[in-house]
Amino acid sequence: MTIELKPGGLLIAIEGIDGAGKTTLARRLTTTLEAAGARVVLSKEPTNGPWGTKLRQSAATGRLSADEEAELLIRDRHEHVDTLIAPALARGDIVILDRYFPSMVAYQGAAGLPLDELLELNAFAPRPDVLLLLDLPPPTGLARIRARGDAPNHFETQDNLERCRTIFAGLELPGKHVVDASADADSVLRQAHAIIVAALADRLSGDGAPADTGKAALELLSAGRPA
């Protein structure tokens, strides 16, 4: 059985400071939901497009100002929404994003740009149905970055990550759920899966689908709950 969520699909954004485990969770959620019959599109920001590539180069070298990075982020996100996110949601897919516009608000905000202006710049971007905020202390995130053999970039200082964490915590967005990312990866996956199943229950009961179809879909998703 293929689980479709028309109209509108389901948009899931995974956020948090560096080292929180966003990429690991995004990949594991995709595998878990696909195994249960969901049609999932996994993506990330910055993307691999021309604007996203410039942004990653900037993260490594620190050559761009906060304003210049913000401009590239918006260009990258416009293209991402138009070419991938909006079409996938229109098909009724589940879209999982490893970072989205809240990261821009947190990181560019930590660099000194006004939060209200950053939110206004992102008004065009579809709001997530589920926003999973992976929260952990910056020293833990930095230790994880070093443990995987990566050298911290200019964003990845304890002071900057503390500022980002504070901004993430203060963002008031619908669908936001705080997940304890200091726990092991299996525990984080279980927390996230339970949140998503609850969101899917709301969507499947309210999108006009036959009751038996929604029930069968939820049974499949619940059966795929991580042990």
UniProtKB/Swiss-Prot annotation:
What are the BP-aspect GO terms? Answer: dTDP biosynthetic process; dTTP biosynthetic process; dUDP biosynthetic process
On whether Nucleotide-binding is a keyword of this UniProt record, the answer is yes
InterPro entries, from UniProt? P-loop_NTPase, Thymidylate_kin-like_dom, Thymidylate_kinase
Pfam families attached to this UniProt entry: Thymidylate_kin
GO CC annotation terms, alphabetical: cytosol
Show the HAMAP family listed in the entry.
Thymidylate_kinase
Q: What does this protein do?
A: Phosphorylation of dTMP to form dTDP in both de novo and salvage pathways of dTTP synthesis.
Protein name according to UniProt? Thymidylate kinase
